[in-house]
Swiss-Prot record:
Gene for this chain: pyrG
Protein name: CTP synthase
Enzyme class: ligase
Pathway field: Pyrimidine metabolism; CTP biosynthesis via de novo pathway; CTP from UDP: step 2/2
Catalytic-site annotation from UniProt: 378 (nucleophile), 514, 516
Complex formation: Homotetramer.
One GO MF term attached to the UniProt entry: identical protein binding
Length: 543
């Protein structure tokens, strides 16, 4: 019988509801409970797949091919549960399904309203997403008081009532600001945020109070008094030097005990030794490398959230401080590759569209010609193929049809036919919808023996997640191979290029998939660990 923990936020956005939820879930998992997490997004987009990275940040791809909120990446990094398309839904998705049923006649001519039809659909999706977990954390996006969040808050109010107090509780994150001129923290914003919640029938059971300064006992007592929350359930969460400390911070204040007692769960004590090891390795590195990351969304680094975290995980696994030097690919176009000098390795991540592509291609050429370790991901592989065709084969007009549909040598092109998650053949074209029409989710990849990528993974077959609609053109591939390009990874059926390497180079690997989506702080990821080791070797060669 699943218990539900609803998580809301107040005062301001971006308080870290996702990380707080994932951290509590990690503690409960460490106590032997089966946990899952859901993210409910109030925006009207059906999913974040076509949203600008500058507005939304990263689109996290699940194993089953859903394009979801980046918080699901936090969830998978903190718990062992694999998220699916059922772990994230939006207002747009809810309305789309309700309207489809209305058109089909499922409501028998009823007037479709927010209550009960929209709220019932939200509740149905929460219950479905929770599955058979012991505890389901349900994070409501946005801030209490936002008009967009109201149907979700009403739905969880109803669900709390329906399942009963022994199976549902509410955690509310708020901000306790520090006023420097007064020299004290202020509790009034938290009081008003809880007042807003209570006005719609929701009484928090726990408050997690975010602050950049310590919150003293008297302030916590004051918050408890004015919000009708137990004093021990007012949890102080100050800024920390690594997010992987947060499970220990919450555990030290007894948050998991409050949950277990409330739900009457029989479970063991929490063993957080894995997290202590992660934090120790993160904060006490023995080595250091600098890696140039050449991207096109550098104004909002959340666009590369999983990738940045994955590089940190590789540092943890190698006891190495990984300093990422963020370089906008357009700056390389304007200022040249001198921006890359001094880097121990070069990383080119994915992206869409023509802007900044020539800067990425220049970064690839610099890495290849100067024997600097290189890792390309998704577009980072495609630009590596383009660079090789131009500068090794001499095809000056080589390009991707994404950027130049009439180029003379389209070494990367739109794949027009493949199988969807059900095994059915799906045909697509340039005129297909942009949303939900990519090669998405986990796919098998066969690795070549004696390759750098095979050495990293230590096995012949891997499963990695994809998010792209362009592939290496098989018609021109033989020319690339003849010129020395090595194809060291192919799709399970052998039809598509998944990994390339360059001969006579210390470490040059580019992959079509996104390995960052499966990297975790406790386990790391073999490809990123191999990349950091290559950067360490490069640094030693330069010394």
């Amino acid at each position: 019988m699943t218990r539900y923990i609803f998580v809301t936020g107040g005062v301001v956005s971006s308080l870290g509801k996702g990380i707080a939820s994932a951290s509590l879930a990690a503690i409960l998992e460490a106590r032997g409970l089966k946990v899952t997490l859901l993210k409910l997004d109030p925006y009207i987009n059906v999913d974040p797949g076509t949203m600008s990275p500058f507005q939304h940040g990263e689109v996290f791809v699940t194993h089953d091919g859903a394009e979801t909120d980046l918080d699901l990446g936090h969830y998978e990094r903190f718990v062992r549960t694999t998220m699916t398309r059922n772990n994230n839904f939006t207002t747009g998705r809810v309305y789309e399904d309700v309207l489809r049923r209305e058109r089909r006649g499922d409501y028998l001519g009823a007037t479709i309203q927010v209550i009960p039809h929209i709220t019932d659909e939200i509740k149905r999706r929460i219950i479905k997403g929770a599955g058979n977990a012991d505890v389901a954390m349900v994070e409501i996006g946005g801030t209490v008081g936002d008009i967009e969040s109201q149907p979700f808050l009403e739905a969880i109010r109803q669900l709390r009532l329906e399942v009963g107090a022994k199976r549902a509780m509410l955690i509310h994150l708020t901000l306790v600001p520090y006023i420097a001129t007064a020299g004290e923290t202020k509790t009034k914003p938290t009081q008003h945020s809880v007042k807003e919640l209570r006005s719609i029938g929701l009484q928090p059971d726990v408050l997690i109070c975010r602050s950049d300064h310590p919150i003293d006992i008297s302030s916590r007592r004051k918050i408890a008094l004015f919000t009708n929350v137990e004093e021990r359930a007012v949890i102080a969460l100050e800024d920390v030097d690594t997010i992987y400390k947060i499970p220990s911070v919450l555990h030290a204040q007894g948050l998991d005990d409050i949950v277990v007692e409330r739900f009457g769960l029989a479970c063991g004590s929490a063993d957080l030794s894995e997290w202590e090891r992660v934090v120790d390795a993160k904060l006490h590195p023995e080595k250091e490398v600098t890696i140039a990351m050449v991207g096109k969304y550098m104004e909002l680094l959340d666009a590369y959230k999983s990738l940045i975290e994955a590089m940190g995980h590789a540092g943890i696994q190698n006891r190495t401080r990984v300093n990422l030097r963020y370089i906008d690919s357009e700056d390389i176009e304007n200022q040249g590759t001198a921006l890359l000098e001094g880097a121990d390795a070069i990383l080119v991540p994915g992206g869409f569209g023509l802007r900044g592509v020539e800067g990425k291609i220049a970064a690839v050429r610099y890495a290849r010609e100067n024997k600097v370790p290189y890792l390309g991901i998704c577009l980072g592989m495609q630009v590596a193929v383009i660079e090789y065709a131009r500068d090794v084969l001499g095809w000056a007009d080589a390009n991707s049809t994404e950027f130049d549909k009439s180029c003379g040598h389209p070494v990367v092109g739109l794949i027009t036919e493949w199988q969807d998650a059900t095994g059915a053949t799906e045909v697509r074209s340039e005129s297909s919808d942009l949303g939900g029409t990519m090669r998405l989710g986990a796919q098998e990849c066969q690795l070549e023996a004696n390759s750098q990528v095979r050495q990293c993974y230590g096995k012949d077959e891997v499963v990695e997640r994809h998010r792209h609609r362009y592939e290496v053109n098989n018609n021109l591939l033989p020319h690339l191979i003849e010129a020395g390009l090595k194809v060291t990874g192919r799709s399970g059926d052998g039809a598509l290029v998944e990994v390339i390497e360059v001969a006579d180079h210390p470490w040059f690997v580019a992959c079509q998939f996104h390995p960052e989506f499966t990297s975790t702080p406790r386990d790391g990821h073999p490809l990123f660990s191999g990349f950091v080791n290559a950067a360490l070797a490069q640094k030693a060669r330069k010394a």
